[in-house]
């Protein structure tokens, strides 16, 4: 990790924000694009759930983002960062502090190097890379949210993860008061995890840099069997970029994983639970539970996840534990298209959603001895 520039200390001994070309950072003040008080947060999330924030700021430049963060840190005000809102579960009581909506924009392509501002809409950016003939993120089409969230979660789907193409993340380090550049190794990526997720109070992502591939209009080799089957090719083959993107969008839409305000199956955070990663011993015990419940002929999904570790399918677990598509009678239910998505049918509260999530977690654990972990970040509530 490196800072953009050596930063002298101010009279208090605290380092000032590092300034790099094109970034002018006000020391203490912010002129927000928008400032609201007792502001509803539900419209900023894909669940459309959650109570109000004491104060809501919207920032459209890196300088505004940094100044807002510094102001909150200097005054000891709790701070909630919101990008696309696709990975947030906010409590019904809301957030007692400042919510900062990061709405920065920026798409810069230099050869095969792509740099995105944190607030750039992710699925739009993917579409533009495909139009430019560059491979590496085409199977991540349709994922809701902003570019700045992708390294935090190490976003992945249909055989691709952003950790494979991210080369650098520019972030504001709240501990040092500097703008820093983190390499891929610095980010400490793992399955749906990163340094940013491990230290959520430290880094504010400002920009993300990717190294893509010019493969003469072809995709990266397909790594996901479902995508390959849908395209009529073998895993490992390349296909036209547009075909790969359109196929993924079609597959996602069929599971309610492409945002549509008229479709309550998309009023969700996409996959609500991560796929469990088990040790070999845990997986052996799990297989025994499966055999006892479903019969010796049934083999649970198993994917290598590093030495001595196996990943299995959360969606399979949920379904086999008896939680089928559309499960639930209240305003929060499992999607009618995909068992891994919990949805707001229009009148739900966050507590309704959490009650359903807890029921699923308890049911899966009782059936198979595996504990599901939520993928979305919870604010003011816990599973």
Curated annotation (Swiss-Prot):
What EC number(s) does its UniProt record assign?
A: 1.3.1.98
Query: What superkingdom does the record give?
Result: Bacteria
Does the entry feature the keyword Secreted, yes or no? no
Q: Which cofactors, if any, are listed as required?
A: FAD
Subcellular location, in the record's words?
Cytoplasm
Active site per the UniProt annotation: 192, 271, 375
Which keywords are on file for this protein? Cell cycle, Cell division, Cell shape, Cell wall biogenesis/degradation, Cytoplasm, FAD, Flavoprotein, NADP, Oxidoreductase, Peptidoglycan synthesis
InterPro entries, alphabetized: FAD-bd_PCMH (IPR016166), FAD-bd_PCMH-like_sf (IPR036318), FAD-bd_PCMH_sub1 (IPR016167), FAD-bd_PCMH_sub2 (IPR016169), MurB (IPR003170), MurB_C (IPR011601), MurB_C_sf (IPR036635), Oxid_FAD_bind_N (IPR006094)
Q: Name one GO biological process term.
A: cell division
The keyword Oxidoreductase is annotated on this UniProt entry: yes
User: What GO CC annotations are associated with the protein?
Assistant: cytosol
What Gene3D superfamilies does the record tag this protein with? 3.30.465.10, UDP-N-acetylenolpyruvoylglucosamine reductase, C-terminal domain, Uridine Diphospho-n-acetylenolpyruvylglucosamine Reductase, domain 2
- Region spans: Disordered: 1-26
Q: Which GO terms describe its molecular function?
A: FAD binding; flavin adenine dinucleotide binding; UDP-N-acetylmuramate dehydrogenase activity
Q: Which reaction does it catalyse?
A: UDP-N-acetyl-alpha-D-muramate + NADP(+) = UDP-N-acetyl-3-O-(1-carboxyvinyl)-alpha-D-glucosamine + NADPH + H(+)
Per the record, the similarity remark reads: Belongs to the MurB family.
Q: What does this protein do?
A: Cell wall formation.
What this protein is called in its record is UDP-N-acetylenolpyruvoylglucosamine reductase
